[in-house]
């Protein structure tokens, strides 16, 4: 039986993506040997470490857990959902190191909408982004993805720029308009 490792970071407030992941685990277990490596953005043990992990987009604790799971479970494929922020983008280096195939399920357009520093680049000449709801009147110049925080928005932009490179340089199947 094929082995699938499902990889996900839960949001602070449970929503549609977390519920979809739970349902997919149940469905996949009917046909595959499935194990899940689930992180939670509610579990922050050291805020200073998390800030460093944010800035370098690599969480050594999450990487170690994934490394152990890859060595013990030996999956045929890793099925990736949300990596923001606890899991981090460091997982892709590990998957490459282990020569492990992976599939990414994109539940939203955060990686696309959040990768620009300036709102003009995000909106691409439009007054409204149909993917995320951002409107040109939301901010003056900066692409403030999180309306309540410039800092969180900046951290997201750093993350999304790297995530977009990963998507661009991987064999990722996308549906385009």
Spans of model-derived segments:
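An aromatic- and histidine-rich active-site surface loop
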Residues: 79-100, 104-137
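Amphipathic coiled-coil/heptad-repeat helices and related helical stalk/stem segments
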Residues: 21, 62, 87-88, 158-160
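N-terminal subdomain of nucleotide-sugar transferases
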Residues: 1-42, 71-73, 91-101, 168-171
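Membrane-proximal helix-turn-helix segments that form the acceptor-binding/catalytic region
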Residues: 64, 97, 110, 121-172
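Generic structural signal for helix capping and beta-alpha/helix-loop junctions
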Residues: 14, 44-46, 87, 112-113
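A short, charged, and often flexible helix/loop element on the N-terminal side
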Residues: 39-67, 80-82, 141-155
């Amino acid at each position: 039986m094929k082995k699938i490792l499902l990889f996900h970071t839960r949001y602070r407030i449970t929503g549609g993506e977390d519920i979809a992941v739970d349902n997919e685990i149940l469905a996949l277990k009917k046909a595959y040997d499935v194990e899940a490596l689930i992180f939670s953005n509610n579990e922050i043990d050291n805020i200073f470490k998390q800030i460093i992990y944010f800035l370098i987009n690599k969480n050594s604790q999450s990487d170690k857990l994934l490394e152990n799971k890859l060595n013990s479970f030996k999956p045929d494929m890793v099925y990736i959902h949300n990596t923001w922020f606890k899991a981090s983008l460091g997982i892709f280096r590990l998957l490459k190191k282990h020569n492990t195939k992976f599939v990414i399920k994109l539940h939203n357009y955060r990686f696309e909408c959040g990768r620009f520093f300036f709102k003009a680049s995000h909106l691409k000449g439009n007054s409204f982004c149909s993917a995320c709801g951002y409107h040109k009147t939301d901010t003056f110049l900066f692409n403030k993805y999180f309306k309540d925080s410039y800092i969180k928005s900046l951290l997201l932009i750093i993350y999304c720029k790297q995530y977009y490179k990963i998507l661009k340089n991987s064999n990722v199947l996308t549906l385009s308009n």
